[in-house]
């Protein structure tokens, strides 16, 4: 795969503000695999280019060890915006259908949750 560096970097910087709604200094988390293009683009390059702290997470965010992993990471690292696949949201809903686990964490700083990569329905 060949990436034209300048255009790719300009697009990543633009999407950090205009898609993920983060300002320099905000904490951003892309719960993706760094081996995928979206992973290294939004775990590494985009946030660092835009002046954001990025959360690097190892493991599955749902089911390991429990459905609260997503929300604990968001609370612990004061995540402002995060991005994941619809599959992760669905797994969270199956594991915690009433949102009881999610409510145990302070996610008041989380302003945006985005999803892409598979159909949401």
Predicted regions: what they are:
Residues 9-13, 41, 67, 89-90:
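Short, well-ordered alpha-helical scaffold segments within catalytic/effector domains
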Residues 32:
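Active-site beta-alpha turn of Rossmann-fold NAD(P)-dependent dehydrogenases/reductases
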Residues 24-25, 50-53, 58-121:
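Conserved adenylate-forming
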Residues 39-55:
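Conserved short alpha-helical elements in the N-terminal third of ANL/AMP-binding
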Residues 18-22:
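Glycine-rich helix-loop-beta junction characteristic of Rossmann-like nucleotide cofactor-binding loops
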Residues 36:
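RNase H-like, metal-dependent nuclease domains and their acidic two-metal-ion catalytic environment used
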Residues 1-10:
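Conserved AMP-binding A3 loop
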């Amino acid at each position: 795969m060949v990436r034209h560096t300048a255009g790719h970097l300009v697009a990543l910087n633009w999407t950090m503000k205009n898609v993920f709604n983060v300002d320099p200094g905000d904490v951003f988390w892309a719960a993706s695999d760094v081996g995928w293009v979206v992973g290294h683009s939004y775990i590494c390059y985009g946030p660092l280019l835009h002046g954001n702290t990025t959360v690097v997470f190892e493991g599955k965010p749902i089911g390991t060890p429990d459905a609260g992993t997503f929300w604990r990471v968001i609370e612990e690292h004061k995540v402002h915006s995060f991005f994941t696949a619809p599959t992760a949201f669905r797994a969270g809903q199956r594991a915690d259908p009433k949102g009881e686990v999610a409510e145990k964490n302070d996610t008041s700083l989380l302003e945006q949750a985005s999803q892409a990569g598979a159909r949401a329905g």
